[in-house]
Amino acid sequence: MWSRNVRLLGSWTRSYMVPATKRKTIPVYPPVQRIASSQIMKQVALSEIESLDPGAVKRKLISKKNKDRLKAGDVVRIVYDSSKCSYDTFVGYILSIDRKQLVQDASLLLRNQIAKTAVEIRVPLFSPLIERIDLLTPHVSSRQRNKHYYIRGTRLDVGDLEAGLRRKK
């Protein structure tokens, strides 16, 4: 009895398996020829920067070659174009200047204290909403660092900058 069942099991085939009758061939194509790079992104960036900053004023503000450039530690006022947006002017201490590979992506990180609350804002430098950037107070020469992140929450932290400027006048 047992030997009869073994013979029957050996002759069964699985119903989901289909026997292969011929070999599959997968076509292999030659590699695509590379076209010489024409630096399209650089050309687009140059045309875009000319429309965003026609007088090169903002480029001079962050240029490392310019002696009167913005540096970490400066106090600046960002004035927005009132016809394009409803933002108020913002006075802030520059914590860092982020220069990117494409110049038009550069931004400023500003810090101020408003109603006893520390506020940080990242301002894209070449935004069409910005009318002008005024330098109010140059940096303190004793803090010569590229980034001033270390002042957060210490005695060096900024107070209410607008109130301080009003008191100086």
Curated annotation (Swiss-Prot):
Record gene name: IMG1
Miscellaneous note of the record: Present with 4150 molecules/cell in log phase SD medium.
Family: Belongs to the bacterial ribosomal protein bL19 family.
Subunit annotation: Component of the mitochondrial large ribosomal subunit (mt-LSU). Mature yeast 74S mitochondrial ribosomes consist of a small (37S) and a large (54S) subunit. The 37S small subunit contains a 15S ribosomal RNA (15S mt-rRNA) and 34 different proteins. The 54S large subunit contains a 21S rRNA (21S mt-rRNA) and 46 different proteins.
Function: Component of the mitochondrial ribosome (mitoribosome), a dedicated translation machinery responsible for the synthesis of mitochondrial genome-encoded proteins, including at least some of the essential transmembrane subunits of the mitochondrial respiratory chain. The mitoribosomes are attached to the mitochondrial inner membrane and translation products are cotranslationally integrated into the membrane. bL19m is essential for respiration.
Keywords: Mitochondrion, Ribonucleoprotein, Ribosomal protein, Transit peptide
Molecular functions (GO terms): structural constituent of ribosome
Lineage, opening ranks: Eukaryota, Fungi, Dikarya, Ascomycota, Saccharomycotina
Pfam families the record matches: Ribosomal_L19
Organism name: Saccharomyces cerevisiae (strain ATCC 204508 / S288c) (Baker's yeast)
Designated name of the protein: Large ribosomal subunit protein bL19m
